[in-house]
């Protein structure tokens, strides 16, 4: 009896869930994506510690590059590529200040994507210089992450660091074919 009740409850719930599912149309999803992108552009983070080159912006730019590609491909709208390019130009395509810190090179992911699209050497030179320097001067910092000890942030010892820095090295490898970027990515500089 109990099995029949549980089976009946499961079937009723699954029918009810299916009945309330509302599939989104592609145009609706794109409209929401556009609204979110436009809101992000119109409402930059006001805190000075989250300037153009800081990691939250780097994460935003990664998503914005994907949106820019879609908006241009499907709607002929290059607004978002132009916005990303303005950010790169006003910062001279530089990563953020701390050389070894994974967060501070995250913005380079979008700069490299823009380089891939436009083939403008200016977009890639600062990232190449930074990664070359890091490869030639590997951190001697500990792999043990110590709360409050900034020296331990020289190594990619926290989980989101794997989103921040290794993709830059992977993209450089894809762009140049130079295996040193593949090796550097694998060694957690």
Residue ranges and their predicted role:
Residues 20-22, 58-75, 106-120, 164-178:
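Well-ordered alpha-helical scaffold segments within catalytic/enzyme domains
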Residues 20-86, 121-133, 137-144:
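Low-complexity, Ser/Thr/Pro/Gly-enriched N-terminal "stalk/linker" regions
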Residues 1-21:
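Bacterial Sec-dependent N-terminal signal peptides
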Residues 83-116:
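Blade-loop segments of beta-propeller domains
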Residues 52, 99-102, 119, 157:
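Structural signature of alpha-solenoid helical repeat scaffolds
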Residues 143-189:
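Aromatic- and glycine-enriched pocket-lining scaffold segments that form the walls
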């Amino acid at each position: 009896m109990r099995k029949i009740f549980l089976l009946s409850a499961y079937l009723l719930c699954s029918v009810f869930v299916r009945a309330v599912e509302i599939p989104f149309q592609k145009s609706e999803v794109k409209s929401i994506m556009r609204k979110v992108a436009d809101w992000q552009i119109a409402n930059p983070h006001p805190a000075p510690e989250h300037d153009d080159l800081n990691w939250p912006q780097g994460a935003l730019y990664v998503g914005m590059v994907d949106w820019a590609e879609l908006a241009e491909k499907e709607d002929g709208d290059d607004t978002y590529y132009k916005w990303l390019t303005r950010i790169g130009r006003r910062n001279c395509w530089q990563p953020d200040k701390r050389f070894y810190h994974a967060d501070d090179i995250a913005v380079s992911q979008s700069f490299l994507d823009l380089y891939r699209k436009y083939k403008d050497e200016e977009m890639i030179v600062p990232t190449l210089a930074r990664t070359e320097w890091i490869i030639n001067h590997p951190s001697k910092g500990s792999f043990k992450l110590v709360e409050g000890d900034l020296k331990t942030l020289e190594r990619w010892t926290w989980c989101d660091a794997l989103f921040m820095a290794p993709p830059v090295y992977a993209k450089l490898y894809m762009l140049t074919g130079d295996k040193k970027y593949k090796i550097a990515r694998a060694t957690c500089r």
